């Protein structure tokens, strides 16, 4: 399977695109990111074009598509897109060892969907942006078809705002 245009746009909307290499606050020393979350062989100060960012994204997604297609060949397009987003953000190795995968392989798609929300932490703390992304991935996974991406984003922005208002 291949990620759909809607799935790719979904990932890109959460990742954002930076055409100059940067070091994220949670990144290990010496790790730089460029484009749509690309971290391979990126040098401090490196710059790329939008076309190069799009190519890096396609190259980064391809091995995820291949591994997921082999691992779970009988998922719908929206389920596949949600899984690609999950793996793109967390890494295929996190998915391979996850309860989400075990439940999906056992045919428990509702149980698998519930597992998305357990992957919202960075450095031991719940991150609102990760909550929004996992909630959106779960919603995508459970859909029988794509709702307009803008509608999904607005819904989860509102949910995120409500969550922020209730944080101590």
What does each of the following model-derived ranges do?
Residues 1-29, 38-43, 47-69, 93-168:
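Long, amphipathic alpha-helical surface segments
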Residues 28-31, 80:
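A structure-centric signal for secondary-structure junctions around beta-strands
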Residues 83:
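Noncatalytic nucleic-acid binding interfaces
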Residues 87-92:
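Short alpha-helix boundary/capping elements
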């Amino acid at each position: 399977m291949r990620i759909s245009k809607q799935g790719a746009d979904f990932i890109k909307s959460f990742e954002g695109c930076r055409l100059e290499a940067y070091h994220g606050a949670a990144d290990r020393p010496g790790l730089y990111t460029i484009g749509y979350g690309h971290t391979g062989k990126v040098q401090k100060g490196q710059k790329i074009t939008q076309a190069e960012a799009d190519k890096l994204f396609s190259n980064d997604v391809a091995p995820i598509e291949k591994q997921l297609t082999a691992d779970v060949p009988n998922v719908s397009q929206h389920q596949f897109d949600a899984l690609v987003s999950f793996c793109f953000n967390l890494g295929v190795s996190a998915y391979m060892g996850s309860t989400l995968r075990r439940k999906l392989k056992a045919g428990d798609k509702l149980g698998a969907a519930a597992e998305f929300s357990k992957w919202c932490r960075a450095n031991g703390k719940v991150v609102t942006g990760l909550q929004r992304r996992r909630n959106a991935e779960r919603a995508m996974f459970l859909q029988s078809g794509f709702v307009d991406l803008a509608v999904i984003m607005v819904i989860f922005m509102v949910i995120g705002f409500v969550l922020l208002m209730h944080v101590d």
